[in-house]
Amino acid sequence: MTNLPKFSTALLHPRYWLTWLGIGVLWLVVQLPYPVIYRLGCGLGKLALRFMKRRAKIVHRNLELCFPEMSEQERRKMVVKNFESVGMGLMETGMAWFWPDRRIARWTEVIGMEHIRDVQAQKRGILLVGIHFLTLELGARQFGMQEPGIGVYRPNDNPLIDWLQTWGRLRSNKSMLDRKDLKGMIKALKKGEVVWYAPDHDYGPRSSVFVPLFAVEQAATTTGTWMLARMSGACLVPFVPRRKPDGKGYQLIMLPPECSPPLDDAETTAAWMNKVVEKCIMMAPEQYMWLHRRFKTRPEGVPSRY
């Protein structure tokens, strides 16, 4: 497994005091009743919308590209709802790291866990397909409480945040792997482990192919799904951590497994995977991470979409 960050007294250096202050404030806020946290998170998101103009434009542009049939009024409403979800995403990160299991369980409805058990009965590994919802951090904790697995992550540039996010994620999971460690993922899957994996972002031109995603005909999509499924023999199980409306809690939804995905070539698998991604996103489109420049990588010589 990856050499994971550990706490050291170096993290108490004055350069990290501001980060510690932010962590302390987040810890205090998430001790409040959940309905209060919900209102604060949505309010924080609306406030962020006023200042994060560049990100708001990215959200609007992504919606424009993916849903050209959506009216301008509908897009503007979606941008507001998405930023409310951004604010809640920060709160949910604190909840994921600092809440006890019993409190998370109280606000979580689990749907489809039988799909995980069915695959485990076949003695096969599970590639848990996680989409970049803004509930993602909490969703990983919720899933780990049902079935501890192995997370895939990108190390944070701030050593304190890197340690804290690792500590928080390991509260209900077995270990973490660097997202570039394909050999480690394949090894774990062959052992029958559950490995979290997100194929929905733009990871650049290397190891990517251009296939459709929503109304975008050429979306750079990772070939990792093809490599992992082909080399490990794992089943793919998509999961959606969805926030209920009006502060009523969460649904953790596991969709039916796909144990024989199309693996003819990388393009075929990537196009199929994007259809799965679309289905998941449409289960809670306002909660997806539209702030990401999903279509920044373009074929050579083709102008930027942003």
Curated annotation (Swiss-Prot):
The keyword Transmembrane helix applies. Pfam families: Lip_A_acyltrans (PF03279). Pathway: Glycolipid biosynthesis; KDO(2)-lipid A biosynthesis; KDO(2)-lipid A from CMP-3-deoxy-D-manno-octulosonate and lipid IV(A): step 3/4; Bacterial outer membrane biogenesis; lipopolysaccharide biosynthesis. The chain crosses the membrane at residues 17-37. InterPro entries: LipA_acyltrans, Lipid_A_LpxL_LpxP. Disruption phenotype: Inactivation leads to bacterial death at temperatures above 33 degrees Celsius. Phenotype at nonpermissive temperatures includes an arrest of cell division followed by the formation of bulges or filaments. Induction: Is expressed at all temperatures, but accumulation of htrB transcripts slightly declines with raising temperature. Thus, its expression is not induced by heat shock. Its EC number is 2.3.1.241. It is found in: Cell inner membrane. GO terms for cellular component: membrane; plasma membrane. It is an enzyme of class 2 (transferase). One of its GO terms (biological process) is lipid A biosynthetic process. Keywords: Acyltransferase, Cell inner membrane, Cell membrane, Lipopolysaccharide biosynthesis, Membrane, Transferase, Transmembrane, Transmembrane helix. Monomer. Belongs to the LpxL/LpxM/LpxP family. Catalyzes the transfer of laurate from lauroyl-[acyl-carrier-protein] (ACP) to Kdo(2)-lipid IV(A) to form Kdo(2)-(lauroyl)-lipid IV(A). Has 10 fold selectivity for lauroyl-ACP over myristoyl-ACP. In vitro, can also catalyze a slow second acylation reaction leading to the formation of Kdo(2)-(dilauroyl)-lipid IV(A). This is Lipid A biosynthesis lauroyltransferase. The gene is lpxL.
